[in-house]
């Protein structure tokens, strides 16, 4: 095993029995051969479960929608990339030449995906309990900073954070109609989200309110909220 990978293991707090799993987790799809996308898929599922379970226990009075919002904050790409930078993960990534030249080792989405892949690799190399322990250890500071006050955000912010947690494009809002007299207008807005086949709609006495209504409708359509939270 190379000295550099041993350094990374110390930072992660886990020593791999099968070094190939670790190397694969660090291999971006731009690199020739097998890549970390399957491990990323697995790690994402484990991360969401572990975070959800921990929040369920930590906030016994929280409603479903509140728990979903807190989890979205924990697992969003920005958070994962920040953790990855703390491990200097970019130094260990295997990238294709083009991705390397364009600075892919600094890119938020690549760092976040690699961290999820490492979670999946740890699970396969050890077991669920070990993967859970690592995830909770890495997210300790994030968990400590969370309160239910964090769920009192407007729908647009909640939608943005949810999409960021899935490494998706941000929603696009468009005013499709304005009705009424200048002193009493009603704005009609559509919100386009890549995860939804249909645009969500909202209306209100201002563009801002209409966008918030459309964002709330998108959250319900995504199954993130049920309309009662």
UniProtKB/Swiss-Prot annotation:
Leading EC class: hydrolase
GO molecular function: double-stranded RNA binding; metal ion binding; ribonuclease III activity; rRNA binding
BP GO annotations: mRNA processing; regulation of gene expression; rRNA processing; tRNA processing
E.C. designation(s): 3.1.26.3
UniProt cross-references to Pfam families, sorted A to Z: dsrm (PF00035), Ribonucleas_3_3 (PF14622)
GO cellular component terms listed in the entry, alphabetical order: cytoplasm
Keyword Protein biosynthesis: no
Compartments it resides in: Cytoplasm
PANTHER family: RIBONUCLEASE 3, RIBONUCLEASE III
Summary of the function given for this chain in its UniProt record: Digests double-stranded RNA. Involved in the processing of primary rRNA transcript to yield the immediate precursors to the large and small rRNAs (23S and 16S). Processes some mRNAs, and tRNAs when they are encoded in the rRNA operon. Processes pre-crRNA and tracrRNA of type II CRISPR loci if present in the organism.
Subunit structure: Homodimer.
Protein's name according to its UniProt entry: Ribonuclease 3
Species whose genome carries this gene: Pseudomonas putida (strain W619)
Gene that produces this protein: rnc
């Amino acid at each position: 095993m190379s000295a550099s990978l041993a350094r990374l293991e110390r930072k992660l707090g886990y020593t791999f029995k099968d070094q190939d799993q670790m190397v694969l987790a660090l291999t971006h799809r731009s690199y020739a051969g097998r890549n970390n996308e399957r491990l990323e898929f697995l790690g994402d599922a484990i991360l969401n479960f572990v975070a959800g379970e921990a929040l369920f226990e930590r906030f016994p009075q929280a409603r479903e929608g509140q728990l979903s919002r807190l989890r979205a904050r924990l697992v969003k790409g920005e958070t994962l990339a920040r953790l990855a930078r703390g491990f200097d993960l970019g130094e260990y990534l295997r990238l294709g030449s083009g991705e390397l030249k364009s600075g892919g080792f600094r890119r938020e989405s690549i760092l976040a995906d690699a961290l999820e892949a490492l979670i999946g690799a740890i699970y396969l190399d050890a077991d669920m309990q070990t993967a859970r322990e690592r995830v909770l250890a890495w997210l300790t500071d994030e968990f400590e900073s969370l309160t239910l006050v964090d769920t009192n955000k407007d729908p647009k912010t909640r939608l943005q954070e949810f999409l960021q947690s899935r490494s998706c494009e941000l929603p696009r809002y468009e005013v499709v109609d304005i009705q009424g007299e200048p002193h009493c207008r009603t704005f009609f807005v559509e919100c386009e989200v890549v995860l939804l086949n249909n645009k969500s709609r909202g209306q209100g006495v201002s563009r801002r309110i209409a966008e918030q209504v459309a964002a709330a409708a998108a959250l319900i359509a995504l199954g993130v909220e049920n309309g009662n939270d």
